[in-house]
Amino acid sequence: MMGLLLRVLCVSALISPALLLFMLLLPGTATAQAPPSWEQIVAAAKKEGTVTVIGPQGNETRDALTLAFQKKYPEIRVELQGMAGNQIGPKLLNELAASKFTTDVIVTGTTTALETLVPGKAVVPIKPVLIGPNTRDLSEWRGGKLTFSDDPQNYNLIFSSYVKAPFIYNANLVSANVFKSWKDLLDPKWHGKITLKDPLSAGGGLGNSTLWYTHEGLGKDFMRRLLTQKDIVMPRDDRQMLDFAARGKYPIAIGPSDVLTNEFIARGLPLKHLHPETLKEGTYVTAGNGSLVIVRNAPHPNALRVYVDHLLSPEGQLEWSKATRFASLRRDVPKDHVLDILVPKENMTYRDISMRHYVDMREEIVQFIKSVLSR
Protein backbone atom coordinates (compact mmCIF):
# COMPACT_ATOMS: atom_id res chain seq x y z
CA MET A 1 0.00 0.00 0.00
CA MET A 2 2.80 2.38 0.94
CA GLY A 3 4.57 1.59 -2.35
CA LEU A 4 1.46 2.45 -4.36
CA LEU A 5 1.13 5.76 -2.53
CA LEU A 6 4.76 6.63 -3.25
CA ARG A 7 4.30 5.85 -6.96
CA VAL A 8 1.20 8.11 -7.12
CA LEU A 9 3.05 10.93 -5.41
CA CYS A 10 5.99 10.60 -7.80
CA VAL A 11 3.74 10.74 -10.88
CA SER A 12 1.84 13.71 -9.48
CA ALA A 13 5.06 15.62 -8.99
CA LEU A 14 5.77 15.33 -12.71
CA ILE A 15 2.47 16.89 -13.77
CA SER A 16 2.47 20.67 -14.19
CA PRO A 17 -0.22 22.59 -12.29
CA ALA A 18 -1.76 23.82 -15.56
CA LEU A 19 -1.98 20.28 -16.98
CA LEU A 20 -3.32 18.95 -13.70
CA LEU A 21 -6.06 21.59 -13.70
CA PHE A 22 -6.94 20.80 -17.30
CA MET A 23 -7.22 17.11 -16.38
CA LEU A 24 -9.54 18.03 -13.55
CA LEU A 25 -11.78 19.86 -16.02
CA LEU A 26 -12.25 16.78 -18.17
CA PRO A 27 -15.66 15.11 -17.88
CA GLY A 28 -15.59 11.76 -16.16
CA THR A 29 -12.77 12.60 -13.74
CA ALA A 30 -13.22 12.09 -10.06
CA THR A 31 -13.50 15.82 -9.39
CA ALA A 32 -15.78 16.69 -12.30
CA GLN A 33 -18.51 17.52 -9.79
CA ALA A 34 -16.30 20.15 -8.15
CA PRO A 35 -14.93 22.39 -10.92
CA PRO A 36 -12.02 24.70 -10.16
CA SER A 37 -12.66 28.25 -9.05
CA TRP A 38 -12.13 31.19 -11.39
CA GLU A 39 -9.07 32.16 -9.36
CA GLN A 40 -7.59 28.71 -9.98
CA ILE A 41 -8.27 28.98 -13.71
CA VAL A 42 -6.56 32.39 -13.88
CA ALA A 43 -3.57 31.01 -11.98
CA ALA A 44 -3.32 28.07 -14.41
CA ALA A 45 -3.66 30.46 -17.37
CA LYS A 46 -0.73 32.50 -16.08
CA LYS A 47 1.36 29.33 -15.91
CA GLU A 48 0.42 28.53 -19.53
CA GLY A 49 1.71 32.00 -20.30
CA THR A 50 0.25 32.38 -23.81
CA VAL A 51 -3.02 32.56 -25.70
CA THR A 52 -2.96 32.29 -29.50
CA VAL A 53 -5.57 34.22 -31.46
CA ILE A 54 -6.43 34.68 -35.12
CA GLY A 55 -8.23 37.95 -35.77
CA PRO A 56 -9.08 40.46 -38.51
CA GLN A 57 -6.43 42.45 -40.31
CA GLY A 58 -5.74 46.04 -39.28
CA ASN A 59 -3.73 47.83 -36.61
CA GLU A 60 -6.73 49.16 -34.67
CA THR A 61 -8.36 45.77 -34.29
CA ARG A 62 -4.99 44.24 -33.39
CA ASP A 63 -4.58 46.74 -30.58
CA ALA A 64 -8.16 46.16 -29.40
CA LEU A 65 -7.58 42.40 -29.20
CA THR A 66 -4.24 42.60 -27.40
CA LEU A 67 -3.30 45.73 -25.45
CA ALA A 68 -5.98 45.95 -22.75
CA PHE A 69 -5.78 42.20 -22.07
CA GLN A 70 -1.98 42.31 -21.82
CA LYS A 71 -2.20 45.22 -19.40
CA LYS A 72 -4.66 43.34 -17.17
CA TYR A 73 -2.86 39.99 -17.44
CA PRO A 74 0.82 40.75 -18.14
CA GLU A 75 1.74 37.13 -17.40
CA ILE A 76 -0.30 35.93 -20.42
CA ARG A 77 1.14 36.90 -23.80
CA VAL A 78 -1.31 37.31 -26.70
CA GLU A 79 0.06 35.92 -29.95
CA LEU A 80 -2.28 37.38 -32.58
CA GLN A 81 -2.19 36.76 -36.30
CA GLY A 82 -4.27 39.04 -38.53
CA MET A 83 -5.82 37.25 -41.49
CA ALA A 84 -8.52 37.74 -44.11
CA GLY A 85 -11.57 35.55 -43.56
CA ASN A 86 -10.97 33.42 -46.66
CA GLN A 87 -7.45 32.56 -45.44
CA ILE A 88 -8.47 31.25 -42.03
CA GLY A 89 -10.26 28.06 -43.04
CA PRO A 90 -7.51 26.55 -45.23
CA LYS A 91 -4.82 27.37 -42.66
CA LEU A 92 -6.66 25.93 -39.69
CA LEU A 93 -8.03 22.81 -41.40
CA ASN A 94 -4.59 21.94 -42.79
CA GLU A 95 -2.99 22.36 -39.36
CA LEU A 96 -5.60 20.24 -37.60
CA ALA A 97 -5.30 17.52 -40.25
CA ALA A 98 -1.57 17.42 -39.51
CA SER A 99 -2.26 17.31 -35.74
CA LYS A 100 -0.73 20.76 -35.30
CA PHE A 101 -2.67 22.44 -32.52
CA THR A 102 -1.45 26.04 -32.42
CA THR A 103 -4.58 28.22 -32.20
CA ASP A 104 -6.95 28.83 -29.28
CA VAL A 105 -9.48 31.46 -30.37
CA ILE A 106 -10.58 32.94 -33.70
CA VAL A 107 -12.34 36.29 -34.07
CA THR A 108 -13.90 36.43 -37.53
CA GLY A 109 -17.10 36.80 -39.52
CA THR A 110 -19.95 34.34 -39.38
CA THR A 111 -19.50 33.29 -43.01
CA THR A 112 -16.03 31.90 -42.27
CA ALA A 113 -17.35 30.13 -39.19
CA LEU A 114 -20.49 28.66 -40.73
CA GLU A 115 -19.20 27.74 -44.18
CA THR A 116 -15.76 26.40 -43.22
CA LEU A 117 -14.90 25.99 -39.55
CA VAL A 118 -18.09 24.42 -38.18
CA PRO A 119 -18.64 21.88 -40.99
CA GLY A 120 -14.90 21.13 -40.94
CA LYS A 121 -15.21 20.15 -37.25
CA ALA A 122 -12.45 22.62 -36.45
CA VAL A 123 -14.25 24.19 -33.50
CA VAL A 124 -15.88 23.11 -30.23
CA PRO A 125 -18.89 24.36 -28.25
CA ILE A 126 -18.33 27.74 -26.62
CA LYS A 127 -20.66 27.59 -23.63
CA PRO A 128 -18.35 25.40 -21.48
CA VAL A 129 -15.74 28.16 -21.81
CA LEU A 130 -18.08 30.89 -20.54
CA ILE A 131 -17.39 30.46 -16.83
CA GLY A 132 -15.74 33.76 -15.92
CA PRO A 133 -17.26 36.72 -14.08
CA ASN A 134 -18.02 38.59 -17.31
CA THR A 135 -19.71 35.72 -19.13
CA ARG A 136 -21.86 34.15 -16.44
CA ASP A 137 -24.22 37.13 -16.05
CA LEU A 138 -26.28 37.60 -19.23
CA SER A 139 -28.47 40.45 -17.97
CA GLU A 140 -26.39 43.13 -19.72
CA TRP A 141 -26.51 41.45 -23.12
CA ARG A 142 -29.16 42.48 -25.62
CA GLY A 143 -32.32 40.54 -24.92
CA GLY A 144 -30.77 39.07 -21.78
CA LYS A 145 -29.05 36.32 -23.76
CA LEU A 146 -26.05 35.54 -25.91
CA THR A 147 -26.44 35.49 -29.70
CA PHE A 148 -25.16 32.64 -31.87
CA SER A 149 -25.18 32.40 -35.66
CA ASP A 150 -25.46 28.61 -35.80
CA ASP A 151 -28.74 26.78 -35.26
CA PRO A 152 -27.60 24.65 -32.29
CA GLN A 153 -26.36 27.91 -30.71
CA ASN A 154 -23.13 26.25 -29.71
CA TYR A 155 -20.22 27.22 -31.90
CA ASN A 156 -20.25 30.79 -33.23
CA LEU A 157 -20.90 33.55 -30.69
CA ILE A 158 -21.76 37.03 -32.02
CA PHE A 159 -20.72 39.92 -29.78
CA SER A 160 -21.21 42.99 -31.96
CA SER A 161 -23.35 44.02 -34.91
CA TYR A 162 -24.22 47.04 -36.98
CA VAL A 163 -26.83 48.26 -39.38
CA LYS A 164 -25.47 48.28 -42.90
CA ALA A 165 -26.03 51.62 -44.62
CA PRO A 166 -27.63 50.98 -48.05
CA PHE A 167 -24.74 52.71 -49.78
CA ILE A 168 -22.10 55.42 -49.48
CA TYR A 169 -22.38 58.55 -51.60
CA ASN A 170 -20.47 61.71 -52.44
CA ALA A 171 -22.48 64.44 -50.72
CA ASN A 172 -21.19 67.06 -53.17
CA LEU A 173 -22.65 65.23 -56.16
CA VAL A 174 -25.58 63.17 -54.89
CA SER A 175 -28.67 64.29 -52.97
CA ALA A 176 -29.96 61.70 -50.52
CA ASN A 177 -33.48 63.13 -50.83
CA VAL A 178 -34.05 61.56 -54.25
CA PHE A 179 -33.86 58.01 -52.89
CA LYS A 180 -37.00 56.38 -51.48
CA SER A 181 -36.47 52.84 -52.75
CA TRP A 182 -33.62 50.62 -53.90
CA LYS A 183 -35.30 50.72 -57.31
CA ASP A 184 -34.38 54.40 -57.65
CA LEU A 185 -30.85 53.22 -58.47
CA LEU A 186 -32.26 51.90 -61.75
CA ASP A 187 -32.91 55.45 -62.98
CA PRO A 188 -30.80 56.03 -66.13
CA LYS A 189 -29.27 59.14 -64.57
CA TRP A 190 -27.22 56.85 -62.29
CA HIS A 191 -25.83 54.77 -65.15
CA GLY A 192 -22.04 54.88 -65.05
CA LYS A 193 -22.03 56.34 -61.53
CA ILE A 194 -22.29 53.22 -59.33
CA THR A 195 -19.80 50.74 -57.95
CA LEU A 196 -20.92 47.51 -56.28
CA LYS A 197 -18.46 45.52 -54.16
CA ASP A 198 -17.78 42.23 -55.94
CA PRO A 199 -20.94 40.22 -55.10
CA LEU A 200 -19.29 36.87 -55.77
CA SER A 201 -17.18 36.93 -52.60
CA ALA A 202 -17.88 37.57 -48.92
CA GLY A 203 -18.42 41.22 -48.10
CA GLY A 204 -20.87 44.05 -48.62
CA GLY A 205 -21.64 43.18 -52.23
CA LEU A 206 -22.78 39.68 -51.36
CA GLY A 207 -24.46 41.00 -48.22
CA ASN A 208 -26.59 43.44 -50.20
CA SER A 209 -27.26 40.76 -52.80
CA THR A 210 -28.58 38.53 -50.01
CA LEU A 211 -30.96 41.29 -48.95
CA TRP A 212 -32.17 41.89 -52.51
CA TYR A 213 -32.52 38.19 -53.34
CA THR A 214 -34.60 37.42 -50.25
CA HIS A 215 -36.73 40.59 -50.22
CA GLU A 216 -40.23 40.09 -51.60
CA GLY A 217 -40.26 43.64 -52.98
CA LEU A 218 -36.96 43.32 -54.87
CA GLY A 219 -35.89 39.77 -55.72
CA LYS A 220 -34.36 38.42 -58.90
CA ASP A 221 -35.96 40.97 -61.23
CA PHE A 222 -34.38 43.93 -59.43
CA MET A 223 -31.03 42.17 -59.32
CA ARG A 224 -31.08 41.40 -63.04
CA ARG A 225 -31.82 45.02 -63.88
CA LEU A 226 -29.18 46.43 -61.52
CA LEU A 227 -26.41 43.98 -62.36
CA THR A 228 -26.86 44.47 -66.11
CA GLN A 229 -27.13 48.23 -65.82
CA LYS A 230 -24.90 50.10 -68.23
CA ASP A 231 -21.38 50.73 -66.89
CA ILE A 232 -21.88 49.42 -63.35
CA VAL A 233 -18.44 48.57 -61.92
CA MET A 234 -17.79 45.74 -59.43
CA PRO A 235 -14.38 46.17 -57.78
CA ARG A 236 -12.85 43.86 -55.19
CA ASP A 237 -10.86 46.67 -53.58
CA ASP A 238 -12.75 48.64 -50.92
CA ARG A 239 -10.28 51.52 -50.94
CA GLN A 240 -10.62 51.88 -54.70
CA MET A 241 -14.41 52.09 -54.39
CA LEU A 242 -14.19 54.79 -51.73
CA ASP A 243 -11.53 56.68 -53.65
CA PHE A 244 -13.75 56.63 -56.77
CA ALA A 245 -16.66 57.96 -54.71
CA ALA A 246 -14.60 60.67 -52.99
CA ARG A 247 -13.20 61.89 -56.32
CA GLY A 248 -16.63 61.76 -57.97
CA LYS A 249 -15.74 59.25 -60.66
CA TYR A 250 -18.37 56.83 -59.31
CA PRO A 251 -20.18 58.84 -56.61
CA ILE A 252 -22.31 55.93 -55.31
CA ALA A 253 -20.59 52.95 -53.67
CA ILE A 254 -22.65 49.91 -52.63
CA GLY A 255 -21.07 47.60 -50.06
CA PRO A 256 -17.59 48.94 -49.28
CA SER A 257 -15.99 48.21 -45.91
CA ASP A 258 -17.64 50.29 -43.22
CA VAL A 259 -14.42 50.40 -41.19
CA LEU A 260 -12.61 51.96 -44.16
CA THR A 261 -15.59 54.21 -44.92
CA ASN A 262 -15.39 55.63 -41.40
CA GLU A 263 -11.66 56.23 -41.87
CA PHE A 264 -12.29 58.13 -45.13
CA ILE A 265 -15.01 60.24 -43.50
CA ALA A 266 -12.71 61.00 -40.55
CA ARG A 267 -10.17 62.37 -43.04
CA GLY A 268 -12.72 64.98 -44.14
CA LEU A 269 -13.64 63.45 -47.50
CA PRO A 270 -17.17 64.28 -48.76
CA LEU A 271 -18.65 60.82 -48.17
CA LYS A 272 -21.83 59.99 -46.29
CA HIS A 273 -23.83 56.91 -45.35
CA LEU A 274 -27.34 56.83 -46.79
CA HIS A 275 -29.56 56.55 -43.72
CA PRO A 276 -30.83 52.95 -43.32
CA GLU A 277 -34.42 54.12 -42.89
CA THR A 278 -34.39 56.10 -46.16
CA LEU A 279 -35.36 53.21 -48.43
CA LYS A 280 -38.75 51.58 -47.97
CA GLU A 281 -37.30 48.08 -48.42
CA GLY A 282 -34.79 48.76 -45.65
CA THR A 283 -31.38 47.21 -45.16
CA TYR A 284 -29.85 44.55 -42.93
CA VAL A 285 -27.68 44.00 -39.87
CA THR A 286 -24.49 42.01 -39.81
CA ALA A 287 -21.85 40.98 -37.32
CA GLY A 288 -19.00 41.95 -39.60
CA ASN A 289 -15.97 40.39 -37.89
CA GLY A 290 -17.67 40.53 -34.50
CA SER A 291 -17.97 36.84 -33.71
CA LEU A 292 -15.74 34.18 -32.20
CA VAL A 293 -15.11 30.44 -32.19
CA ILE A 294 -13.01 28.15 -29.97
CA VAL A 295 -10.61 25.85 -31.81
CA ARG A 296 -10.61 22.09 -31.26
CA ASN A 297 -7.71 20.83 -29.12
CA ALA A 298 -6.74 24.37 -28.16
CA PRO A 299 -3.20 24.37 -26.71
CA HIS A 300 -3.94 26.80 -23.86
CA PRO A 301 -7.31 25.73 -22.40
CA ASN A 302 -7.16 27.96 -19.33
CA ALA A 303 -5.68 31.04 -21.01
CA LEU A 304 -8.38 30.96 -23.68
CA ARG A 305 -11.07 30.99 -20.96
CA VAL A 306 -9.51 34.08 -19.39
CA TYR A 307 -9.08 35.73 -22.81
CA VAL A 308 -12.69 35.13 -23.89
CA ASP A 309 -13.97 36.39 -20.54
CA HIS A 310 -12.00 39.61 -21.01
CA LEU A 311 -13.04 40.06 -24.65
CA LEU A 312 -16.69 39.78 -23.66
CA SER A 313 -16.31 42.09 -20.65
CA PRO A 314 -17.44 45.75 -20.77
CA GLU A 315 -13.79 46.80 -21.05
CA GLY A 316 -12.94 44.35 -23.82
CA GLN A 317 -16.10 45.16 -25.76
CA LEU A 318 -15.46 48.90 -25.51
CA GLU A 319 -11.98 48.46 -27.00
CA TRP A 320 -13.42 46.37 -29.83
CA SER A 321 -16.27 48.81 -30.44
CA LYS A 322 -13.91 51.80 -30.58
CA ALA A 323 -11.62 50.02 -33.02
CA THR A 324 -14.38 48.92 -35.39
CA ARG A 325 -16.83 51.77 -34.64
CA PHE A 326 -19.64 49.22 -34.37
CA ALA A 327 -21.92 48.66 -31.41
CA SER A 328 -21.38 45.86 -28.92
CA LEU A 329 -24.31 43.61 -28.09
CA ARG A 330 -23.59 44.45 -24.45
CA ARG A 331 -25.99 47.16 -23.31
CA ASP A 332 -23.54 48.52 -20.71
CA VAL A 333 -20.93 49.46 -23.34
CA PRO A 334 -21.05 53.14 -24.45
CA LYS A 335 -22.02 53.85 -28.05
CA ASP A 336 -21.16 57.56 -28.26
CA HIS A 337 -18.26 56.79 -30.63
CA VAL A 338 -20.53 54.88 -33.06
CA LEU A 339 -22.54 56.63 -35.76
CA ASP A 340 -26.14 56.52 -34.57
CA ILE A 341 -27.42 55.25 -37.92
CA LEU A 342 -25.21 52.15 -37.56
CA VAL A 343 -26.52 51.20 -34.10
CA PRO A 344 -29.28 48.54 -34.16
CA LYS A 345 -32.35 49.81 -32.32
CA GLU A 346 -33.92 47.46 -29.78
CA ASN A 347 -37.46 48.25 -30.97
CA MET A 348 -36.67 47.51 -34.63
CA THR A 349 -36.73 44.21 -36.51
CA TYR A 350 -33.86 43.68 -38.92
CA ARG A 351 -32.92 41.06 -41.48
CA ASP A 352 -29.80 39.61 -39.87
CA ILE A 353 -27.73 38.08 -42.64
CA SER A 354 -25.17 36.76 -40.14
CA MET A 355 -27.58 33.97 -39.27
CA ARG A 356 -27.20 30.48 -40.69
CA HIS A 357 -30.45 30.66 -42.70
CA TYR A 358 -29.00 33.42 -44.89
CA VAL A 359 -25.41 32.16 -44.94
CA ASP A 360 -26.66 28.81 -46.25
CA MET A 361 -28.27 30.62 -49.20
CA ARG A 362 -25.02 32.26 -50.32
CA GLU A 363 -24.05 29.60 -52.86
CA GLU A 364 -27.51 29.74 -54.46
CA ILE A 365 -27.28 33.54 -54.65
CA VAL A 366 -23.76 33.46 -56.10
CA GLN A 367 -24.83 31.01 -58.80
CA PHE A 368 -27.75 33.26 -59.73
CA ILE A 369 -25.44 36.29 -59.97
CA LYS A 370 -23.02 34.34 -62.17
CA SER A 371 -25.87 33.37 -64.48
CA VAL A 372 -26.91 37.02 -64.83
CA LEU A 373 -23.39 38.32 -65.43
CA SER A 374 -22.60 35.63 -68.02
CA ARG A 375 -25.36 36.77 -70.37
Residue ranges and their predicted role:
Residues 166-173, 210-214, 287-300, 319-320:
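A bilobed periplasmic-binding-protein/Venus flytrap-type ligand-binding module shared by bacterial periplasmic
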Residues 290-353:
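Mature extracytoplasmic/periplasmic domains
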Residues 35-46, 52-77:
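Short, polar/charged alpha-helical segment
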Residues 6-19:
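Short, low-complexity, charge-dense intrinsically disordered segments
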Residues 55-67, 79-93, 101-242, 246-247:
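Extracytoplasmic ligand-binding site segments that recognize negatively charged/polar headgroups
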Residues 34, 345-375:
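Conserved C-terminal helix/tail region of periplasmic/extracytoplasmic solute-binding proteins
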Residues 223-228, 232-235, 268-296:
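Periplasmic-binding protein-like
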Residues 112-116, 252-272:
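A ligand-binding cleft/hinge motif common to bilobed small-molecule-binding domains
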